[in-house]
Regions:
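Positively charged, low-complexity/disordered segments
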Residues: 1-9
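Iron-sulfur cluster-binding electron-transfer modules in prokaryotic oxidoreductases
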Residues: 8-188
């Protein structure tokens, strides 16, 4: 594991302040970043900073959306069939079911056959697209057969890699939820 070099600084100088010394949750909108912060940050910190870190509530956006936002959103009728790509980092966080639940709020969620780690690994899709091509072969075939209306995930690099390799417009589940919660337009 090689966490971002600036992660320790960000924690020490920013997360503590932004969270009002642990009173507000820290919501991270990228499963791989949430996983890194939750899993790697404590070992990078000194004893007093570890104690502070333990008082922070670090939440991935998927669980925050499901538990805190969706109950208050006026969701419009279903928006069709939704291909869901659960990121592997989200699986490590235990977020897969929450991601599927969010997609089901918006329409008919389905995890395509063959969905596993997309192989994007941060910027690797830009440098080695063959990794993603190989890792997603079965998923891409399933996407082509699935007749989906929407394509969602919970990690921007996965979305970018899948869009680039599969040619499907993957986006964050948060974007689909935003559209599904817009007020219905009354025809003139």
């Amino acid at each position: 594991r090689s966490p971002s070099r600036g992660l320790g600084y960000v924690y020490k100088r920013q997360l503590w302040e932004w969270s009002s010394q642990g009173k507000l949750p820290v919501v991270i909108d990228a499963a791989s970043c949430t996983h890194t912060v939750v899993d790697s940050m404590p070992e990078m910190l000194g004893e007093s900073d570890r104690e502070r870190f333990a008082r922070l509530r670090i939440l991935d956006s998927v669980k925050w959306l499901r538990d805190a936002a969706v109950p208050h959103l006026p969701i419009t009728p279903p928006r069709g069939k939704i291909a869901v790509h659960p990121p592997c980092s989200g699986a490590h966080l235990g977020n897969t079911e929450a991601l599927i639940e969010l997609a089901n709020v918006c329409g008919e969620a389905e995890v395509p056959v063959g969905t596993a780690c997309c192989g994007t690994a941060g910027d690797r899709v830009m440098l080695h697209p063959e990794l993603v091509e190989s890792a997603t072969r079965e998923e891409r075939e399933s996407l082509a057969r699935g007749h989906y209306d929407h394509f969602v995930s919970a990690n921007r690099t996965c979305e970018m890699g899948l869009e680039m390799i599969a040619g499907k417009p993957f986006e964050s589940i948060a974007c689909l939820l935003e559209r599904a919660s817009r007020p219905s337009q009354v025809p003139l």
